[in-house]
């Protein structure tokens, strides 16, 4: 099915482009969301008549998104979850969880705007892309930890999944520290 795009859509094209997409994608996503019109003569004339208005609305939305992006860019958000000793989460952190945390911190965000290839399943610092507008994207840090104290340690750069951090071992003892005497070391061997 051929459609006329009413806004920029990644991997498809810019506003005003006539592109061919699969019927299901057009019927189930593009047309109901108001992101495209069917490419027939009546809709082409309608689009050309409203093009200036649509471009102005798109520019306004882009400017609003850019203002939010300036505040949001580089921000760090803490997510507290249960995890095992090795740092594996009991469950995962998904786009919905990240959107809820960002919204709880005063930003308006929908989970579809969070771009995550797969759910996060380990503690640590994770960089996540947020698409506020098709042309405006920002990166935020999501600090996933077992507690807020642990999150502060991770923010300082400490690795909480290493053996030293898990068991409280600072360094391995040297053989001279274990055995008082070289003779004892030889007797033990």
UniProtKB/Swiss-Prot annotation:
Top-level taxon of origin: Bacteria
InterPro entries: Ribosomal_bL9 (IPR000244), Ribosomal_bL9/RNase_H1_N (IPR009027), Ribosomal_bL9_bac/chp (IPR020594), Ribosomal_bL9_C (IPR020069), Ribosomal_bL9_C_sf (IPR036791), Ribosomal_bL9_N (IPR020070), Ribosomal_bL9_N_sf (IPR036935)
UniProt record, GO biological process: translation
GO terms for MF: rRNA binding; structural constituent of ribosome
PROSITE patterns according to UniProt: RIBOSOMAL_L9
Function text: Binds to the 23S rRNA.
HAMAP family: Ribosomal_bL9
Entry's family note: Belongs to the bacterial ribosomal protein bL9 family.
Name of the protein described by the UniProt record: Large ribosomal subunit protein bL9
Species of origin: Brucella melitensis biotype 2 (strain ATCC 23457)
